[in-house]
């Protein structure tokens, strides 16, 4: 990203044409980053709540006063010797996407404090842990090599809106004669540009993968040599797949059997063949197993032998040997303490739990949560079952500190809101989950108002808490210099990174042509320790698994992000919200007609957990039996002050303890038909 600065103000944001994987392209949302930075709603000074929780009444205070009070209150909650420090919970995710402004000084602070640990599961942990269980790490093919593929299967990814740089390479391949197949319940912008679209039911991706395997076996489209030398556990999965003929897979997926046969034929007979997998498909009960089944497919046909063959879900695991996470986060500051772990995806339930409450697994909850420190996240908008999340954050006895750019739904319920810098105002280091380049993010302009980087806020708070370890004196540049291991140990030299702006990892062109996966044996683990052989798991909520529930709520709902939002980020940018208009629900014409719904009409979407209202859009983007509730809108910016997470639940995926956002049954009716009881 290249920022044009005039008189100390960022006036334009462009892509860097010299950056190899992106070639100067920016998506619409990031191209408006200057508008976001100078938004009239920026929080530029520390704020303290003076009214009731959620009243929106705050007063401006100085940094010293705010930090002193926060430190005093956290110290009081932690108790003598920090005995009750687990009652304090950090809550963060990927807001800055950076190594420094993410988990460096913040991690040091909470390790030293002995606070509860956070299981950061809200986005990708089901697929990520599934990939690690199969390949040994979150690793895959080079994104640049898709340009040379002859078949590209885009599975669970609206790449035009969420992975623009991959899409550029896919288009190059298409122009050279490659076939593109999109697998997605929704007829996305990407699906419209592919040669074929398989619109399966949400949560049935594992069944489709097993049906493809069945056809690979019976037609002998297998690379027996690659399977024998570079996989473990194939016989058991082979037996399982043979029980999934196309007819069974198709019936489960809600598609035609010929679609399964055709996909298997294309995949089994085309070289090089590549899969671009993304995280939408793993946000259901069986998402981890489905990701494992899909990740095994390239091994069965020997796709990894070609540099333009294989699979990419995430490349972030390639950086695992380059980053010195211990130097950044200092887990040694915990000493002998072993704090409990809170799953960020069940924060709605956990904020309402009492001390020692018996949990479903037979364990005890531990101390009631008394304080939350939120940074790089907006949980009131993005966490599942938001009715419970709001109820927890609204507790008057909960002390909440939020580091933010804006008064988000979460900030509205805080006791203190501390102004944080944006990407244009601080130093950071970035790695990628879509390519293999590390980048440096230099500050382009001085911080606005009294905004401080996350690192600076936690550094100052540590001083107020009396944490005198030398590591809390590290500057951001000090952190940047130790973030990566030396080049001789697989990392990067900071001076080189700063001089060039980016550095590429040294990874083989065809990394698994001869096996060499990151597992102990170097083989793809079809039978993975602790997980066994993957299988199809039906959704928590579906006609097959919960017929009585489905009779009341017959429509499956998925909630992918709006094209011009990054989950809840950018929702308050006026120009982008102007493009999106208002929250909508996409619904199939037949499903709409059966309910007396016409396009543009206000509808009510509901289940036992809650309800929302928005505008219906009737058309082909939704397949029969599925509605698409696009998000993630801030509740306060939606017409009914709610969003789709009012309807989602907190049950977790099979692998990775992740939320199953897309495993959700609802009913829809005209808003005018509802009469409050």
Describe each PLM feature range.
Residues 192-200, 421-424, 436-448:
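Short beta-alpha connecting loops at secondary-structure transitions
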Residues 66-88, 142-150, 240, 261-274, ...:
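Glycine-rich phosphate/diphosphate-binding loops that line cofactor/substrate pockets in enzymes
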Residues 103-171, 176-183, 206-210, 296-413, ...:
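Extended redox/cofactor-interaction regions of prokaryotic respiratory oxidoreductases
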Residues 118, 223-224, 260, 274-275, ...:
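Acidic/polar loop patches that form or flank catalytic/metal-binding clefts of enzymes
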Residues 212, 232-353:
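Active-site phosphate/pyrophosphate-binding segments
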Residues 1-221, 256, 375, 637-677:
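N-terminal export/assembly segments and adjacent metallocofactor-ligating motifs
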Residues 448, 454-500, 573-586, 590-677:
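Long, contiguous, secondary-structure-rich segments that constitute the structural scaffold
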Residues 49-63, 79, 83, 219-257, ...:
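N-terminal leader/propeptide and maturation segments of large enzyme subunits in energy/redox metabolism
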């Amino acid at each position: 990203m290249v920022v044009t600065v005039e008189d100390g103000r960022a006036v334009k944001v462009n892509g860097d044409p010299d950056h190899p994987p992106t070639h100067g392209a920016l998506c619409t949302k990031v191209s408006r980053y200057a508008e976001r930075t100078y938004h009239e709603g920026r929080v530029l000074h520390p704020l303290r709540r003076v009214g009731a929780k959620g009243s929106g009444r705050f007063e401006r205070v100085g940094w010293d006063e705010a930090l002193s009070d926060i430190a005093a209150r956290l110290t009081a909650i932690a108790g003598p010797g920090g005995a009750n420090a687990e009652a304090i919970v950090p809550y963060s995710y990927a807001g800055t996407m950076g190594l420094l402004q993410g988990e460096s000084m913040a991690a040091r602070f909470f390790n030293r404090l002995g606070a509860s640990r956070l299981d950061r599961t809200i986005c990708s942990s089901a697929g990520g842990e599934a990939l690690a269980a199969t390949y040994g790490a979150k690793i895959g093919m080079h994104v640049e090599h898709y340009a040379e593929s002859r078949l590209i299967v885009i599975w669970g990814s609206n790449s035009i809106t969420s992975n623009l740089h991959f899409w550029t390479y896919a288009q190059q391949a298409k122009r050279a004669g490659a076939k593109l197949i999109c697998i997605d319940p929704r007829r996305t912008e990407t699906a419209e540009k592919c040669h074929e679209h398989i619109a399966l039911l949400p949560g049935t991706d594992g069944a489709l993968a097993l049906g493809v395997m069945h056809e690979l076996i019976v037609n002998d489209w297998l690379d027996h040599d690659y399977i024998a030398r570079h996989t473990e556990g194939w016989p058991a999965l082979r037996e399982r797949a043979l029980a999934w003929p196309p007819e069974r897979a198709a019936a489960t997926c809600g598609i035609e059997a010929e679609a399964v046969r055709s996909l298997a034929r294309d995949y089994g007979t085309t070289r090089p063949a590549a899969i671009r997998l993304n995280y939408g498909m793993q946000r259901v009960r069986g998402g981890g197993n489905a990701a494992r089944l899909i990740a095994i497919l390239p091994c069965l046909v020997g796709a990894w032998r070609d540099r333009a063959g294989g699979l990419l879900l995430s490349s972030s695991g390639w950086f695992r040997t380059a980053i010195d996470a211990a130097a950044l986060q200092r887990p040694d500051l915990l000493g002998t303490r072993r704090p409990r772990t809170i799953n960020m995806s069940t924060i709605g339930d956990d904020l309402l739990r009492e001390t020692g409450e018996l949990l479903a697994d037979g364990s005890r909850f531990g101390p009631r949560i008394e304080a939350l420190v939120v940074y790089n996240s907006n949980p009131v908008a993005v966490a599942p079952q938001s009715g419970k999340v709001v109820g927890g954050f609204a507790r008057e006895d909960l002390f909440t500190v939020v580091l933010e750019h804006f008064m988000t739904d979460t900030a509205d319920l805080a006791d203190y809101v501390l102004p944080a810098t944006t990407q244009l105002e601080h130093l950071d280091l970035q790695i990628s989950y879509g390519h293999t380049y590390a980048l440096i993010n230099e500050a382009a302009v001085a911080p606005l108002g009294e905004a401080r980087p996350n690192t600076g806020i936690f550094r100052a708070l540590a001083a107020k808490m009396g944490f005198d370890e030398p590591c809390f004196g590290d500057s951001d540049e000090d952190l940047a210099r130790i973030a990566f291991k030396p080049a001789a140990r697989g990392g990067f030299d900071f001076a080189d990174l700063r001089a060039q702006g980016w550095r590429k990892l040294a990874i083989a062109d065809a990394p698994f042509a001869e096996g060499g996966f990151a597992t102990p044996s170097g083989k793809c683990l079809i039978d993975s320790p602790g997980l066994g052989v993957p299988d199809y798991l039906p959704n928590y909520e579906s006609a097959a698994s919960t017929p009585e529930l489905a009779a009341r709520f017959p429509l499956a709902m998925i909630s992918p992000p709006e094209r011009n939002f990054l989950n809840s980020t950018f929702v308050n940018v006026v120009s982008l919200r102007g493009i999106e208009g208002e929250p909508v629900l996409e619904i199939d014409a037949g499903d709409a007609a059966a309910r007396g719904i016409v396009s543009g009409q206000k509808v009510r979407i509901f289940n036992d957990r809650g309800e929302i209202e928005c505008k219906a859009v009737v058309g082909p983007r939704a397949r029969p039996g599925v509605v698409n509730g696009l998000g993630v809108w801030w509740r306060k910016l939606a017409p009914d002050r709610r969003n789709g997470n009012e309807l989602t639940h907190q049950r977790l995926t099979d692998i990775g303890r992740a939320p199953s956002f897309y495993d959700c049954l609802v009913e829809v009716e005209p808003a005018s038909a509802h009469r409050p009881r």
